[in-house]
């Protein structure tokens, strides 16, 4: 499979590589039997709505939904993403994700991690491991689970088990913080 894919990719991109270096596009996207030039610095300033796709593993929660903006928290801080935002890929922390619709309503989700792919042509794809509406989470249950995981941390037998429990604790603490500020 990879041999034929690699051969097709090379055969499609070979003409680009043989041309003068200044003729190479800055970015390109491989599609079946064609190469499409992409300008990652193209100005897209007159966009009215951001097209948001929000996925959880293999399930769509939102599919190219027109929204005013989305707020995500990444490893480098919080990002407010509006139409025409610069191209960026953001690694998400366990935190709330806020979606503001064009009619002014908002929905808050909790994401356990993932990536946000912000495209400068007015779309944003947020791919998460787990994502749920913040209203569906219960603070009392989260606090009970935190106590149970802290007890399990003391009884962890090896480093692997301890690491798994520490990850659970950090996500549950993020859920509790999000629920307290909601």
UniProtKB/Swiss-Prot annotation:
The GO terms this record gives for MF are: proton-transporting ATP synthase activity, rotational mechanism
Q: Where is the signal peptide?
A: none
Q: How does it assemble?
A: F-type ATPases have 2 components, F(1) - the catalytic core - and F(o) - the membrane proton channel. F(1) has five subunits: alpha(3), beta(3), gamma(1), delta(1), epsilon(1), plus the additional subunit P18 (Tb427.05.1710) that is not present in F(1)F(o) ATP synthase from metazoa. Subunit P18 (Tb927.5.1710) interacts with the alpha subunit with a 1:1 stoichiometry; the interaction is direct. Subunit gamma is part of the central stalk. F(o) has three main subunits: a, b and c.
InterPro entries per record: ATP_synth_F1_dsu/esu (IPR001469), ATP_synth_F1_dsu/esu_N (IPR020546), ATPsynth_dsu/esu_N (IPR036771)
Recorded topology in the membrane: Peripheral membrane protein
Q: Which GO terms describe its cellular component?
A: mitochondrial inner membrane; proton-transporting ATP synthase complex
Keyword line:
ATP synthesis, CF(1), Hydrogen ion transport, Ion transport, Membrane, Mitochondrion, Mitochondrion inner membrane, Transit peptide, Transport
Q: Where is the transit peptide?
A: 1-17
The role this protein plays is:
Mitochondrial membrane ATP synthase (F(1)F(o) ATP synthase) produces ATP from ADP in the presence of a proton gradient across the membrane which is generated by electron transport complexes of the respiratory chain. F-type ATPases consist of two structural domains, F(1) - containing the extramembraneous catalytic core, and F(o) - containing the membrane proton channel, linked together by a central stalk and a peripheral stalk. During catalysis, ATP synthesis in the catalytic domain of F(1) is coupled via a rotary mechanism of the central stalk subunits to proton translocation.
The protein depicted here goes by the name ATP synthase subunit delta, mitochondrial
Give the species: Trypanosoma brucei brucei
**Family to which this protein belongs:** Belongs to the ATPase epsilon chain family.
Q: Where in the cell is it found?
A: Mitochondrion; Mitochondrion inner membrane
